[in-house]
Design a protein with these regions (language model features):
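Alpha-helix C-terminal capping/helix-to-coil transition sites in glycosyltransferase folds
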Residues: 47, 198-200
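Short hydrophobic core segments
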Residues: 145, 201-208
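Beta1-alpha1 glycine-rich phosphate/pyrophosphate-binding loop at the start
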Residues: 121-188, 213
């Protein structure tokens, strides 16, 4: 069973406990574990002998080391999206990870830039945050501009439906990485040509996100029509339908 985002971590804990009581051999459990504290508790309480981290090891292969060093805020959590790992595995393609673009390229690392540049990143969604972090790690001076008062972009909206809250962990981890790397983040700042001319960046990364796909249906522009993004963002109410 490949547990999706809506399934909580450790969902099979009670079943594993029953198996542990019934057998005399070591029991290893797996079940969307992303928190080392929970895994440690399972072993300490004798509910299992070992906890296996599957997809979490793809999202962050250094998670055990970070837990040992008590750097929990640095961990990159698996959001159980099943997009880069399971979907590619069944398609016979190389496995990748939505929260860890370095998967499979760990040995390459982030090569330092030959020349440090002043970099402007437009957009504080996940793509913008990731680009800003990597550029800063390469040695550039990076400033990220977000037009609204919230980071995360469309991924933030994707986390609002019931059962999707863990998606916010992806946003949080990128924010933490940017902050620790030294990225300057400016909120409520729309980027204009005048601002670009004023700041004089060497490079500009446009990560302003996508626009909602609206089908060409007659009447779709009626004010009574509520679009999903407006509903999720709290800009419109859907009533009790």
């Amino acid at each position: 069973m490949w547990a999706p985002t809506v399934t909580h971590g450790g969902f099979s804990a009670s079943q594993v406990e029953e198996i542990k009581r019934a057998v005399s051999i070591p029991v290893i459990t797996v079940g969307r574990y992303t928190e080392p504290q929970f895994a440690e508790l399972m072993v300490k309480e004798g509910r299992c002998d070992l906890v296996a981290f599957g997809r979490q090891s793809l999202a962050d292969p250094y998670m055990p080391l970070k837990a040992q060093e008590e750097r929990l805020e640095d961990m990159i959590p698996c959001i159980a999206c099943l997009q880069g790992c399971v979907a590619n595995m069944y398609a016979g393609n190389p496995v990748c990870c939505l929260v860890n673009p370095f998967l499979g390229h760990e040995a390459e690392g982030i090569a330092p830039a030959e020349k440090a540049k002043k970099v402007m990143v437009i957009g504080g969604g996940v793509a913008g945050l990731c680009a800003a972090f990597i550029a800063q790690e390469k040695g550039h001076q990076v400033t990220l501009y977000e037009a609204s008062d919230k980071l995360g972009g469309n991924m933030r909206l994707a986390a609002y439906p019931p059962g999707k809250g863990d998606i916010t962990n992806m946003i949080r981890s990128y924010i933490v990485r940017c902050q620790k790397a030294g990225v300057t983040i400016k909120m409520n700042q729309e980027v204009t040509l005048d601002l670009i001319r004023e700041e004089k960046p060497d490079s500009v990364i446009v990560a302003s996100g996508s626009r909602t796909l609206i089908l060409p249906i007659e009447g779709i522009d009626n004010p009574a029509i509520i679009h999903g993004s407006d509903l999720l963002d709290g800009k419109r109410a859907a009533g009790k339908k």
